[in-house]
Amino acid sequence: MQCTRAVARLAGGLARTAWATQHTYKHRPAILGLLEQPCRLCSSTGVVDNTNKTKPGTAEAAEGGILKRVLNKVGFTPNTKARLKVTSHLLYESVADKINYVTFFRDFNLPNTFNSWFLVTELHVWLLLMRSMAEGSETGEDGRFLRNCIVEAMWGDVNTRAKKLGAHNPSRTRQQIETLSEQFQAALIAYDEGIMSDDRVLACALWRRFFEMNCDDYAQIERLVKYVRQQASMLDSLPRDQFIVKPKVAWLELDKCKV
């Protein structure tokens, strides 16, 4: 179970467009309202055989199939969609509740705004998505479903926070969230390419997205590259039980990651 292979699957599951791979994260005038507000909320995201042939054991198999479907609906099997949905929220909460955002703002000279909160959240959510795809990237598999649920949980939180900050202008808030969504999709592709390549490629991806091309301190970029590599290694080492069944993600502290 390697994150690098999972990343390739993740990248394959995304719609790669020419625009996305060349996206330079240009800020539009529309995002200057909500995204630059002080972040009061984050200072403390086959073929079916229809013949009627009767074969030995058919009735028993049918009964077993019905029982399995019933158990799946009520959540008594270990890998139900309902269980994975709960897991996705627990994993997202491990980011929103346990990451020290203030440390990121301070150490990387980020303004205390909603946009900075999203950039930090986005980076850690991407790490979770990469690890999720190691559990199966095909349609219907646990990893792909879990990935989608984590993204849903993140956008649910983003919408809640954005509405509180932009309650006076809901229409503009929606437009700004759409802009973030476009940037998020492009960031996933850039980060995937970076993690599968050497540190220079990853550093470029982080400089363009996380630092928004506004960082001349190479030590800061090198430190963030090291931090991302260490977090990816930590997640890759987690067995399925500690990631999906009973999520126990112990994020490494930024303060302990020095160049």
UniProtKB/Swiss-Prot annotation:
Protein's name according to its UniProt entry: Ubiquinol-cytochrome c reductase complex assembly factor 1
One Pfam family it belongs to: Ubiq_cyt_C_chap
Keywords, comma-separated and alphabetical: Membrane, Mitochondrion, Mitochondrion inner membrane
Record-stated family: Belongs to the CBP3 family.
Domain of life: Eukaryota
Transmembrane segments: none
Assembly: Interacts with sloth1; the interaction is probably involved in the assembly and stability of the mitochondrial ubiquinol-cytochrome c reductase complex.
Main location: mitochondrion
Role this protein plays: Required for the assembly of the ubiquinol-cytochrome c reductase complex (mitochondrial respiratory chain complex III or cytochrome b-c1 complex). May be involved in cytochrome b translation and/or stability.
GO cellular component: a single term: mitochondrial inner membrane
GO biological process terms, semicolon-separated: mitochondrial respiratory chain complex III assembly
Subcellular location: Mitochondrion inner membrane
Annotated InterPro entries: Ubiq_cyt_c_chap (IPR021150), Ubiqinol_cyt_c_chaperone_CPB3 (IPR007129)
